[in-house]
Amino acid sequence: LLELENVHEYLDHSVGEKVISIEELFETSLKRTSNMSLLAPCDFQAVKACGVTFAKSMVERVIEERAAGDPKKAESLRNHIGGLIGDSLQDIVPGSEKASEVKKALISEGLWSQYLEVGIGKDAEVFTKAQTLSSVGFGSEVGLNPISNWNNPEPEIVLAVNSKGIIQGATLGNDVNLRDIEGRSALLLGKAKDNNASCSIGPFIRIFDDSYTLEDMKSANISLKVEGKEGYILNGSSSMSEISR
């Protein structure tokens, strides 16, 4: 479908047979009460992800690295490192002359990191998030490797890209991350990111057309709510307008 030149026109003129209502499908997907549930809206495509794309995440990656995966050390490092380099990373265009100047300054202060290199350097961090056909869909439980004690969901916008590199649409995803594993060594990124059911995508792809474009997506806000069985509630959000690369 994504290989078509005008996907939205094809879909506008497509006629299908109604199998189930959206409301019923959402309910069965969430409750797992039948065999009918939503799958991830991708099949044979490679599932890639980019890391260190926000200034805030750059600081967090440096904290993980300095803490060597120990969450107990993270808070004091967050106050120290965030105060030193947090503001200097705002509004920097990766690979620019200003980015090079900041890099030199941070190196002289002993604060340069491989994560800052992919955050404001000329080359982005691109990694394999999940194996083909391994992503789970809306309503499915995500997987957490039991070797991890410090981990988190990462709500993301997922781009639907065809084989020519053309972005045809977007959806939502959960880039589950094991912070204590990656924090020990960047070479453990694959172990921290690619686990059973660690990639959730869906529910649907919003195909770009005249009413919703890539430019519209760049100003989108993503919200996340985590509710624990013990009554713990966490609300968070991120804005695509703050993305740095």
Task: Tell what function each PLM region has.
Residues 207-209, 218-245:
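Active-site neighborhoods and metal-handling regions in enzymes and metal-associated proteins
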Residues 1-16:
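Gly/serine-rich nucleotide phosphate-binding loop at the start of the catalytic core
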Residues 1-3, 164-173, 232-236:
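Short, well-ordered strand-loop elements centered on a beta-strand within folded domains, enriched
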Residues 12-225:
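Active-site microenvironments in enzyme catalytic cores
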Residues 4-8, 174-177, 239-244:
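A short, sequence-level motif marking secondary-structure junctions
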